[in-house]
């Protein structure tokens, strides 16, 4: 994996920085593990915008990822590493001994030809998936389940990981990259090691069109709108917002906490916020 600074042949390429990985597969993805994915442009089933700044972009197939890793005791060989347009991490195509192929999130350090295992008897090695009760305290993990059998939900992005801090009774404590310490049931599964493609955060888009390829539309400032469109809008010429920053619906931004899920608050030992 290398970081390439593009030659400034145009204003759009002058600030562009690419992450090049020559180990990635250059052919087509495995057809049996693809699914169709229609563009929603940020709209829900009523046609109303629920997520702003989305629309357009290149057509993409969804890669069906195995987040559960439930084929216990069956060795799997990494056939190839692939790019996935739907996530920041790369993915790995693994071939199990019984002939089945699946996609998984590619862990850091896993190479083509390496053998992976899942289950309580799997060795503590990068890429292997075990229940948290079988993972030693202090181990770096990723792709962590929040409910047993539901599939990995935490620490799935490029370069992310968590650390297993302690086990007490039916629950373990895991420190996430954000600093939050969370309780997780010991029957939940996690994968050893970190997520690969850790240099993803170093890339520079370079030009607006590169974001349009990804389906990201422009973000208009509130002070550039009319009063009917945003609380910051209106005024003659360029004006300040005239109030603390808020969203288009009047909710304070820049640090205002909006979490309302009291049901799972007991699972958070330490919040990621310092205050």
Curated annotation (Swiss-Prot):
Known InterPro entries for this protein?
NA-bd_OB-fold, Rib_uL2_dom2, Ribosomal_uL2, Ribosomal_uL2_bac/org-type, Ribosomal_uL2_C, Ribosomal_uL2_CS, Ribosomal_uL2_dom3, Ribosomal_uL2_RNA-bd_dom
Sorted alphabetically, the keyword list is:
Ribonucleoprotein, Ribosomal protein, RNA-binding, rRNA-binding
Q: Could you list the residue ranges forming a coiled coil in this record?
A: none
Annotated membrane-spanning segments are none
Question: What family does this chain come from, according to its entry?
Answer: Belongs to the universal ribosomal protein uL2 family.
Q: Which domain of life is it from?
A: Bacteria
Establish whether keyword rRNA-binding is in the entry.
Answer: yes
What function is annotated for this protein?
One of the primary rRNA binding proteins. Required for association of the 30S and 50S subunits to form the 70S ribosome, for tRNA binding and peptide bond formation. It has been suggested to have peptidyltransferase activity; this is somewhat controversial. Makes several contacts with the 16S rRNA in the 70S ribosome.
A molecular function (GO) term: structural constituent of ribosome
Tell me which Gene Ontology terms the entry assigns under biological process: cytoplasmic translation
- Official protein name in the record: Large ribosomal subunit protein uL2
- Oligomeric form and interacting partners: Part of the 50S ribosomal subunit. Forms a bridge to the 30S subunit in the 70S ribosome.
Keyword hit for Disulfide bond: no
Which is a Gene Ontology cellular component entry for this protein?
large ribosomal subunit
Xref: Pfam families: Ribosomal_L2, Ribosomal_L2_C
Q: Where is this region: Disordered?
A: 38-60, 224-257
Task: Return the Polar residues bias intervals.
Answer: 38-53
| Native species | Burkholderia mallei (strain ATCC 23344)
Stored PANTHER family: LARGE RIBOSOMAL SUBUNIT PROTEIN UL2M, RIBOSOMAL PROTEIN L2
């Amino acid at each position: 994996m290398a970081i390439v600074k593009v030659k400034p042949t145009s204003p759009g390429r002058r600030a562009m920085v690419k992450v090049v990985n020559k180990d990635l597969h250059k052919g087509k993805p495995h057809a049996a593990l693809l699914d169709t994915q229609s563009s929603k442009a940020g709209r829900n089933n009523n046609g109303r915008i629920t997520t702003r700044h989305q629309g357009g972009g290149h057509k993409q197939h969804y890669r069906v990822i195995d987040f559960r890793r439930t084929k216990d005791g069956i060795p799997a060989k990494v056939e190839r590493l692939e790019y996935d347009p739907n996530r920041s991490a790369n993915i790995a195509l693994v071939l199990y001994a019984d002939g089945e192929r699946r996609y998984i999130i590619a862990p850091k350090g896993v190479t083509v030809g390496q053998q992976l295992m899942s289950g309580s008897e799997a060795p503590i090695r990068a890429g292997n998936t075990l229940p948290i009760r079988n993972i030693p305290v202090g181990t770096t993990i990723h792709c962590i389940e929040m409910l047993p059998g539901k599939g990995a939900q935490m620490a799935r992005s490029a370069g992310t990981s968590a650390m297993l801090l302690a086990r007490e009774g039916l629950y373990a404590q895991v420190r996430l990259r954000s600093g939050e310490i969370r309780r997780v049931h010991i029957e939940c599964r996690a994968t050893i090691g970190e997520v690969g493609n850790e240099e993803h955060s170093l890339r520079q888009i370079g030009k607006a069109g590169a974001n349009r390829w990804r389906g990201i539309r422009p973000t208009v400032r509130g002070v550039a709108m009319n009063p009917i469109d945003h609380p910051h809008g209106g005024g003659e010429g360029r004006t300040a917002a005239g109030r603390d920053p808020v969203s288009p619906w009047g909710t304070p931004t820049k640090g205002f906490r909006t979490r309302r899920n009291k049901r799972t608050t007991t699972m958070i030992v330490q919040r990621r916020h310092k205050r």
